Structure formats: structure tokens, C-alpha cells
A protein has these predicted regions:
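N-terminal helical cap/lid subdomain that shapes the substrate entry/recognition surface
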Residues: 5-19, 23-137, 141, 145
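Conserved SAM-binding loop
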Residues: 23, 149, 213-214
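Glycine-centered short loops/turns at secondary-structure junctions
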Residues: 146-147, 228
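Conserved phosphate-coupling serine/threonine residues in phosphotransfer and NTP-handling enzymes
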Residues: 153-155
Length: 285
């Protein structure tokens, strides 16, 4: 473990875990499926650009497809419906009464269709390729004896359900303890927006000092830090050739430490709990 700043873990009661690339190695297979839909999407906008899965993963990890699709349209100068431009003040826009025959513009209805297509493709693929991982299940099972486990993700609930079933994590983090930036909020707001963490904390009835976020991606870490949470980076499923760069980026995003495995987190929390017990005994004496 690398620690960058002091961590006060005495009040932690809930571990708020990002899902993709953190609880299971879903990033690479997800982008295998997502790239096919993404390329059909950019073609529908009249763009010649195409993405391979690895390129897409490196440029969009931590974001959901909805955000990625709008970002791609804006970056390419494709007009978007004003309702989609809330976070893109400089974007080219068209009127909300855009004629159906208009070419190479993105409406909210069209975006929703692409979001659903990508969701179905990725969910089906992940449900087939993911498997239970003892290196995740064993430490999380032990941690669940002392902490409530929750998932806080940018991904859709259907995708999360398929992943949690395939990896055997259903029993540790059931559906009611999964929070989706795509489906749980009144309006979808992907990380790095802190909305999904703030929503999860409110639903769980905890203060920011009671939740510890564990994130593998920079947008995810930025989301948790912006929500006021102590955050630990996790590079367990980050490709080895990318780990040094990711560790540095996570540090800049504000994480307090970086771990290489869930076992490391278990040892860290056990150590802090033991230290707290010793201090409590000293205080009583």
C-alpha cells in the first residue's frame, strides 16, 4: 500500500465500492462490447472516426456510455439538443423541434436509444465472461462482518446485476445496496459528478466520515473526493503497464492511499481497528 495523507478510519461503518474495474475486472470485456456500439453511434453522426476497445477504454474509463456519447458528439462539432448541453456550455446546439429528417445531430431520444443498445450489449457480454474471484470474495466476506458493503457506480443497474451474479457478489452487496449514477438518480449524472455518492450516503443514512470510498478510476476518485469522502485507490485490476501512471493520477485526484489488492484493504482496516482498541484501553486506564 502507498499512503499519501493521513486517514482517519475510526468512524468508518460503510465501504462504498466502485464496481467496474474495482470489484471485478469488467473494464476490458465491457469495452469489447461497447466499442461495437460506439462505432455504430459515431457512424450515425456522419463521423469517420472509429475506436478499438483499448483506445476507448483508455479515454473513457470511469464514465458511462451516456456521458461518453455526448462528449464524442460535442468534441466532433455535432449539434446536440439543448437538453443535452447542460454540462457543455460551448456545444453546438439545435432547436428542440429538430425536424426528424435532419442529419448528423443528436437528440435526447436518439441518445436514449443508443444508451439502451449499449447497455444490453455490454450486460449480456459481461454476464458470460465474468467469474467469481477468491482474491475479492474472501477479503470482502471478512470485511462484511465489520462493515456494511455498498456499490456506488456509474453503470446501469441491469449491468450491475449481471456482474454481481456472475462474480458471486450478490450475497455481499444485494441490489438494495447498489447505487447507479445512470438509474438511481432523478436524472443520470455520471462520475466525476459527486451526485451518486451524495445520494448513496443520504440513502444509507451516513455522514461523510462514516463512508470510505474505494475507486480504481480517476473520475470515480474525483467523484468520491468531491462528495467529501475519504477515498482509497485500488489498482488490483489495472493492467500492470498502466499502474504507475494510474497511481499518480489517483494521488492527484485526492485519494489518501492506493492498494494493490482487497486483501491489503482488509489488513489496513484490521490494523486501524486494533490500534483503536489499544487506544481505548489506554484511555480507560
Amino acid at each position: 500500500m502507498l499512503q499519501f495523507r493521513a486517514l482517519d478510519l475510526r468512524s468508518i461503518t460503510v465501504l462504498m465500492c466502485d464496481a467496474d474495474g474495482n470489484l471485478f475486472p469488467s473494464e476490458e470485456p465491457a469495452f469489447d462490447a461497447s466499442a461495437k456500439v460506439t462505432n455504430r453511434f459515431v457512424a450515425s453522426l456522419g463521423l469517420s472516426r472509429r475506436f478499438d476497445p483499448e483506445e476507448l477504454r483508455l479515454s473513457t474509463t470511469g464514465k458511462n456510455f451516456r456521458t461518453t456519447a455526448v462528449d464524442l458528439a460535442v468534441a466532433s462539432g455535432v449539434p446536440i439538443e439543448p437538453a443535452l448541453a447542460v454540462r457543455h456550455p460551448g456545444a453546438a446546439t439545435t432547436t428542440t423541434d429538430l425536424p426528424s429528417a435532419a442529419q448528423h445531430a443528436l437528440t435526447a431520444a436518439q441518445l436514449e436509444g443508443w444508451v439502451q443498445e449499449e447497455k444490453q450489449a455490454v450486460t449480456a457480454h459481461l454476464g458470460q465472461v465474468l467469474r467469481p474471484d477468491p482474491a475479492v470474495l474472501q477479503p470482502l466476506t471478512a470485511l462484511a462482518r465489520d462493515f456494511l458493503l455498498a456499490a456506488v457506480s456509474s453503470s446501469a443497474t441491469a449491468r450491475l446485476a449481471a456482474c454481481f451474479t456472475a462474480t458471486g457478489l450478490d450475497r455481499l452487496i444485494p441490489a438494495e445496496l447498489r447505487f447507479s449514477a445512470e438509474d438511481s438518480l432523478l436524472a443520470p449524472r455520471s462520475k466525476p459528478d459527486p451526485a451518486v455518492y451524495l445520494f448513496a450516503g443520504e440513502r444509507l443514512g451516513i455522514s461523510r466520515w462514516q463512508g470510505l470510498a474505494i475507486e480504481d478510476s480517476v473520475p470515480g476518485a474525483q467523484s468520491a473526493v468531491a462528495a467529501g469522502l475519504q477515498t482509497i485507490g485500488n489498482v488490483a485490476f489495472v493492467p500492470p503497464t498502466e499502474r504507475v501512471e494510474r497511481v499518480n493520477a489517483l494521488r492527484q485526484a485526492g485519494v489518501g492511499a492506493v492498494i494493490w489488492s482487497w486483501g491489503e484493504l482488509k489488513r489496513l482496516l484490521d490494523q486501524r481497528r486494533a490500534q483503536a482498541g489499544i487506544q481505548a484501553n489506554i484511555n480507560r486506564e
